[in-house]
């Protein structure tokens, strides 16, 4: 079986801990050979790019350079990391000036980068490398009756729609259906969750998050399932504020890896189910789980 | 050894003429300098410049000089030989010189128009002139071969273009075979309800022409058939046609359709292609009531008998003319024709390539062709505008330029969408009373009475919003939007983003080349433009001709085109074919190859090289020979003959070697 | 009795095979000897340069010169003979087009000398001494001819009247040439004294050649057991016959060896190698570049194969650098 | 103004695709380098390797051969014959010291006027970088080594004539 390197980024070590726990648990259950990238550093996130382009590329580039020594694909579950690393990869490939500067910087740190690393998203790997067939086989405990609103966020399909449709992504839907869940069809799969605006311009950020939550509820979803730590944080963490500003939605926001894990019969405790601010207990119980 | 001996011999007298082409050439090339330069070259007896060499006085001048100055060779530096070679050959002939003692120099397309530095362009012109003058010395006196033209014509594609071309030719007394891939002729037009801008019913004006084709004594109609092979040359094409099995004997079926009622499937069950899948049909079916020929056919994919061989065959039983034949096989037929008209039509843009418009995701989203059937009295809903969910739309949004004028999909304007969108807007409003919104980039209504039609719709209260729709979504932001499809668009006239809630969205898809356009053009040995439509010989002066003589193109296979233009073009193509046929013969370029028998060692190298089997090996003489009528003059054999025993007229080794030396010698 | 017409034989850069060819006339040579006075024939008789110089210009009816020209001495000799002879016959492939010696045109003079005097395994030359064109020994100046950088055909140095092709020319065409000279029935200047039709015409294997070769690989004679009847090209062997002037009566194919092109091309062809390539490769089977290259790999030394006897007269004459 | 080397390029274009494309480039008023001299043939298959060698021998710095795309030949398969011959010719040119870039085979369809422009511009640029080939000049230089002796011999003749005259 193919080997992979895992790039956690800051979120999966912090606010997105549940994502890391469930992701690694699922990988383990699938028998994937995956190892955390040694001595990785901050990807720079989307903000840094607009401030210090070259430096931000060098920062992200360092991770690519370390990965290249191993000559393995890198899995970046965090959407921001996924986007930034891919953007860097692209910039280093296409812009000779930037490559020159960045590689010089890396050389100073005893590193080099040829540009061979592939940065991939868990969805991509699960669907295209592992395959639905294998996954379905491992579904011991299908989450029957669980109605989910699959929410992809903006970063994994924009600007690079490498493994899914830019307007109507479906890979997560497929996985959730394989897990036994029902998926609502809705048009907001890739609409903005508010991003950093929830912190900087709350009146705008909260509204955007509210739109997603409300629509999901309207479509009869018991929970939103996502793949982005920031989306999860915005949609889950601000529901209190949203309740006071608009209305109470009370919509649990899970990671797709959590649902997958449950369906594969892994204990909720290993999947960080309890870490959610809006408790998923009820819906999951409805889904006949645990 | 004997190299360049000919140079020492006395040179033939060359006349050199350079054309200003108004300022086309003169503005970038110092015509006088080239004329003076040529005058000083060995063998040049006369050197002149003139404003328009191709004009009558220009040609007269040449003819006169040939006589007065006893010119033995002619060189004209002007435009591309593809344009005026023939003109100046005639001028030479007028002066009593064999037309092939002539060489043309292309200093317009290949120099004046493509360079920016007058000095270097002029130098280039000199080099090319010098080369032609060096080469023309070796030219020989040649005659064009005349071959008879077969008066029969093949028309490929039975849309309105093919129908019109076939009828025009047949009315002129020519025997025409019309080959159509589908089970009926009529093409896209047969699927339309009304036609813009006159709103006369498509069926009413088309079906008479369709039946005229069927009943015309001079037309053989082969539907459900495809051309599989084309051999031969202008005036003498041999065409192989494959006729797919209908499993119903065409000559016996009268189209009573009782077999359809009798079919074991009591209800129509399968997507019906003609109705864009909006309607259903049985395994035994006929596309539409006026289908021509009015002959049913059986679909092997869905017919139980053909799939399993286990069916009571009530259809066959119901046919008192015993027309059914489940063992029918595809048959191949051969035709001899002199000319071919290609009118293979177009394909509409695949909306799956524009997922933001939600086709397939939202049942309320339709393609324009689907709506054509929806508003059509003989369509699946008998003309009633009913949505897939059975409801009637109160508001309809029509999105223009889907798959047109778009860097992401197709760059070109599809030319008909604005007008048919207006037509559909009118029809939908008329049939359903719904509010109709048109979302357009620019309104293009350049045809006769088109702009007036646009005015008329403005008067009818159809809404027009200028802007490219960003997305179609069912996400409601306001109560009014609940349960609706919302079109998000920047209104570029009002200058803000609007959300328009509707019940039905119509995607005005653009026109594309047929998916198999490339194979087809290879089969007929013609070209395609970069966007994939068939390439005309000249965009302005030979719009229905191709680079292969005797093969003409008409309609949307050449470029997006509406019905009036298509019919006009079909007429033009038919006229071109007629002028070829009625001449009775074609003159073939004499640029054929021949083998000098006493030089041939009989090594057979050339024999397999000829794609037209023009070269054969004479077992008695043990030498190869070339049939100059079959030879199309590519010269591959001449280049390959290892003992230099094959000559290609107009491209002999001496001619090319001297041209090489000519362009390089300073 | 009037003295017999005088003829001269001379050899330049050649293997001696052409001399052999003259001897191969067998008893016919007696006729020749009887008919003419040989005034120069280094391989067989002892004449000195002074003897020739002493003769009045144009006093020799014909000079037969074989071998390519690659030293200053050869140039002196052929120029001298040009003066003394009425007719110069370029004798054999080397004189006509450089022959085997002209393959040296693929290398620079220096690299050749370096190999021969320094690097060649069988050389013992610790002082790395190279021959000098001039050296003084005990007050006497000794000279050696200069080795030229370009190997030339005879007609690239002096004006030539007739050409006898072949490596070597066959007794038959030699005899015809001699008789023509003696009888004075001479063809136009510059004529190659051999048929203008390619070799296939006279090859016994001709009928066994299929029209469509569609070759998928080329083999070399040592790699296959050669069918003695079948066309050699059809067996995947490079046979230059189709691009080579006839006249030898297909000796090599007769001896179960492919034609290597020693008679040179017909007059209608300027570059034998290029023309042969044009003919044979038009018709190999593959259409994809990679597959085509695979077939071409069967010919490791194209220049040596297609210009074995004619590099001096090829359009490019020698390797550039 | 600095005199930069302007390469001479001989271009053999097939009538149906590449020559037509060059016409199209003209009609579209595309601008490209004036270094190429087009020789029209009906099919790239007419181009005998001898033509390419002769062009170089007569002073071309580069030779361009343009035909229809594989599968699109107006004469069905002429361009495949071209491809096969020219693959071998390219090897021979290399062995004779004429390296890649000086000889180029391009497939340009009748619709690709812009490709005529880009190919000729690109080739002009690359051949300019390679510098002059100038075989005619090289031939002259090569023959310098035999001129001295030739001169002597001729001089020898002159002297004699002088003597006779005296």
Across the structure, where does each feature detected by a protein language model lie?
Chain D
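Iron-sulfur-associated redox domains of electron-transfer enzymes in respiratory
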Residues: 1-166
């Amino acid at each position: 079986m193919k080997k992979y390197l895992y790039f956690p980024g800051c979120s999966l070590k912090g606010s997105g801990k549940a994502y890391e726990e469930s992701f690694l648990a699922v990988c383990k259950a699938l028998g994937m050979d995956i190892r955390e990238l040694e001595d990785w550093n901050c990807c720079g996130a989307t903000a840094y790019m607009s401030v210090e382009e070259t430096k931000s590329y060098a920062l992200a580039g360092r991770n690519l350079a370390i990965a290249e020594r191993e000559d393995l694909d890198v899995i970046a579950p965090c959407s921001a990391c996924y986007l930034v690393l891919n953007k860097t990869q692209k910039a280093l490939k296409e812009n000779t000036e930037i490559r020159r500067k960045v590689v010089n910087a890396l050389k100073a740190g005893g590193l080099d980068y040829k540009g061979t690393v592939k940065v991939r998203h868990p969805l991509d790997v699960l669907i295209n490398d592992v395959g639905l067939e294998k996954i379905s086989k491992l579904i011991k405990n299908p989450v029957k009756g669980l109605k989910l609103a699959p929410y992809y966020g903006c970063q994994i399909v924009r600007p690079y729609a490498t493994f899914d449709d830019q307007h109507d992504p479906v890979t997560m839907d497929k996985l959730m259906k394989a897990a036994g869940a029902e998926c609502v069809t809705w048009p907001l799969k890739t609409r903005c969750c508010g991003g950093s605006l929830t912190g900087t311009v709350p009146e705008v950020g909260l509204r955007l998050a509210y739109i997603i939550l409300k629509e999901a509820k309207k479509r009869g979803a018991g929970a939103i399932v996502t793949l982005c730590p920031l989306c999860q944080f915005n949609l889950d963490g601000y529901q209190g504020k949203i309740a006071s500003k608009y209305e109470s939605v009370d919509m649990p926001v899970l990671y797709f890896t959590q649902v997958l894990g449950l369906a594969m019969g892994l204990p909720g405790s290993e999947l960080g189910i309890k870490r959610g601010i809006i408790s998923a207990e009820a819906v999951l119980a409805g889904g006949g789980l645990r | 050894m004997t190299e360049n001996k000919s140079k020492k011999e006395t040179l033939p007298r060359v006349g050199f003429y350079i054309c200003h082409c108004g300022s086309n050439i003169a503005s970038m090339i110092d015509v006088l300098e080239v004329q003076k330069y040529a005058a000083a070259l060995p063998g040049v007896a006369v050197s002149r410049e003139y404003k328009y060499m191709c004009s009558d006085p220009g040609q007269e001048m040449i003819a006169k000089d040939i006589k007065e100055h006893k010119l033995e060779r002619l060189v004209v530096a002007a435009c591309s030989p593809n344009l005026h070679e023939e003109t100046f050959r005639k001028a030479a002939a007028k002066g009593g010189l064999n037309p092939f003692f002539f060489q043309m120099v292309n200093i317009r397309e290949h120099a004046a128009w493509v360079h920016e530095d007058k000095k270097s362009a002029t130098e280039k012109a000199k080099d090319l002139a010098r080369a032609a003058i060096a080469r023309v010395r070796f030219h020989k006196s040649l005659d064009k071969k005349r071959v008879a033209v077969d008066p029969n014509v093949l028309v490929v594609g039975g849309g309105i273009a093919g129908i019109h071309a076939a009828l025009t030719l047949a009315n002129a007394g020519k025997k025409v075979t019309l080959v159509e891939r589908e089970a009926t002729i009529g093409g896209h037009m047969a699927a339309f309800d009304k036609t813009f801008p006159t709103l006369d019913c498509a069926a009413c004006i088309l079906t008479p022409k369709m039946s005229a084709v069927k009943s015309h004594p001079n037309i053989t109609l082969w539907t459900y058939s495809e051309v599989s092979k084309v051999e031969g040359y202008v005036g003498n094409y041999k065409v192989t046609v494959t006729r797919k099995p209908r499993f119903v004997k065409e000559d016996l079926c009268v189209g009573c359709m009782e077999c359809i009622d009798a079919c074991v499937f009591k209800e129509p069950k399968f997507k019906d292609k003609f109705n864009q899948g909006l309607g259903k049909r049985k395994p035994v079916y006929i596309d539409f009531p006026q289908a021509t020929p009015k002959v049913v056919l059986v679909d092997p994919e869905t017919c139980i008998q053909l799939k399993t061989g286990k069916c009571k065959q009530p259809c066959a039983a119901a046919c008192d003319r015993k027309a059914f034949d489940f063992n029918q096989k595809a048959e191949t037929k051969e035709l001899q024709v002199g000319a071919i008209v290609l009118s293979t039509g177009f394909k509409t843009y695949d909306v799956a390539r524009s997922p933001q418009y939600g086709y397939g995701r939202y049942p309320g989203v339709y393609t324009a062709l689907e709506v054509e059937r929806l508003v059509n009295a003989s369509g699946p809903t008998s003309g009633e505008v009913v949505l897939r969910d059975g409801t009637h739309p109160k508001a309809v949004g029509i999105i223009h330029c889907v798959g047109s004028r778009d860097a992401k999909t197709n760059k070109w304007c599809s030319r008909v969408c604005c007008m048919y969108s207006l037509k559909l807007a009118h029809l939908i409003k008329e049939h359903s009373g719904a509010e109709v919104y048109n979302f357009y980039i620019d309104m293009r209504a350049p045809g006769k009475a088109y702009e007036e039609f646009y005015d008329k719709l403005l008067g009818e209260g159809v809404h027009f919003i200028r802007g490219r729709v960003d997305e179609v979504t069912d996400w409601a932001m306001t109560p009014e939007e609940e349960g609706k499809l919302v079109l998000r668009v920047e209104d570029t006239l009002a200058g803000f983003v609007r959300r328009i809630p509707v019940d039905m969205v119509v995607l005005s898809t653009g026109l594309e080349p047929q998916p198999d356009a490339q194979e087809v053009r290879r089969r007929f040995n013609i070209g395609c433009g970069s966007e994939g439509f068939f390439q005309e010989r000249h965009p302005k002066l030979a719009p229905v001709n191709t680079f292969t003589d005797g093969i003409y193109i008409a309609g949307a296979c050449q470029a997006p085109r509406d019905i009036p233009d298509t019919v006009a073009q079909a007429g033009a193509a038919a006229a071109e074919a007629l002028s070829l046929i009625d001449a009775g013969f074609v003159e073939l370029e004499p640029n054929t190859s021949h083998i000098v028998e006493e030089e041939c060692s009989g090594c057979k190298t050339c024999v397999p090289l000829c794609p037209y089997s023009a070269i054969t090996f004479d077992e008695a003489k043990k030498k190869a020979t070339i049939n100059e009528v079959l030879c199309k003059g590519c010269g591959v054999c001449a280049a390959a003959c290892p003992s230099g025993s094959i000559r290609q007229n107009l491209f002999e080794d001496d001619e090319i070697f001297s041209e090489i030396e000519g362009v390089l010698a300073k | 009795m009037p003295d017999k017409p005088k003829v001269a034989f001379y050899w330049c850069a050649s293997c001696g095979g052409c001399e052999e060819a003259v001897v191969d006339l067998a008893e016919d040579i007696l006729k020749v000897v009887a008919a003419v006075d040989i005034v120069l024939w280094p391989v067989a008789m002892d004449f000195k340069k002074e003897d020739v110089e002493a003769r009045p210009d144009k006093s020799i009816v014909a000079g037969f010169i074989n071998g390519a020209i690659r030293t200053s001495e050869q140039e002196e000799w052929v120029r001298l003979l040009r003066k003394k002879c009425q007719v110069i016959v370029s004798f054999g492939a080397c004189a006509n087009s450089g022959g085997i010696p002209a393959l040296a045109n693929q290398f620079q003079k220096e690299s050749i000398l370096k190999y021969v005097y320094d690097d060649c395994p069988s050389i013992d030359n610790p002082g790395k001494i190279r021959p000098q064109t001039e050296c003084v020994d005990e007050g006497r100046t000794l000279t050696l001819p200069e080795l030229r950088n370009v190997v030339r055909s005879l007609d690239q140095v002096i004006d030539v009247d007739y050409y006898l092709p072949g490596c070597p020319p066959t007794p038959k065409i030699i005899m015809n040439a001699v008789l023509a000279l003696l009888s004075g029935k001479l063809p136009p200047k510059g004529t190659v004294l051999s048929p203008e039709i390619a070799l296939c015409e006279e090859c016994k294997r001709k009928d066994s050649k299929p029209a469509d070769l569609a070759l998928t690989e080329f083999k070399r004679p040592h790699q296959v057991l050669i069918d003695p009847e079948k066309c050699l090209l059809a067996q995947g062997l490079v046979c230059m016959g189709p691009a080579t002037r006839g006249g030898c009566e297909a000796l090599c194919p007769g001896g179960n060896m492919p034609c290597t092109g020693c008679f040179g091309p017909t007059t209608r062809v300027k570059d034998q190698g290029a023309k042969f390539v044009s003919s044979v490769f038009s018709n190999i089977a593959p259409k994809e570049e990679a597959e085509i290259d695979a077939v071409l790999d069967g010919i490791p030394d194209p220049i040596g194969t297609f210009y074995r006897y004619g590099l001096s007269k090829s359009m490019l004459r020698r390797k550039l650098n | 103004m600095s005199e930069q080397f302007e390469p001479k390029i001989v271009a053999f274009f097939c009538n149906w695709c590449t020559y037509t494309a060059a016409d199209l480039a003209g009609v579209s008023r595309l601008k490209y380098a004036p270094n190429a001299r087009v020789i029209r043939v009906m099919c790239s298959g007419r181009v005998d390797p001898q033509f390419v060698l002769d062009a170089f021998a007569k002073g071309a710095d580069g030779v361009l051969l343009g035909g229809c795309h594989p599968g699109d030949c107006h004469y069905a398969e002429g361009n495949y014959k071209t491809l096969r011959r020219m693959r071998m010719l390219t090897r021979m040119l290399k062995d004779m010291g004429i390296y890649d870039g000086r000889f180029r085979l391009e497939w340009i369809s009748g619709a690709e006027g812009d490709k005529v422009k880009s190919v000729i511009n690109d080739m002009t640029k690359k051949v300019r970088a390679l510098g002059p080939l100038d075989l005619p000049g090289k031939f002259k230089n090569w023959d310098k080594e035999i001129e001295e002796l030739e001169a002597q011999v001729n001089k020898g003749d002159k002297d004699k004539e002088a003597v006779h005259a005296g």
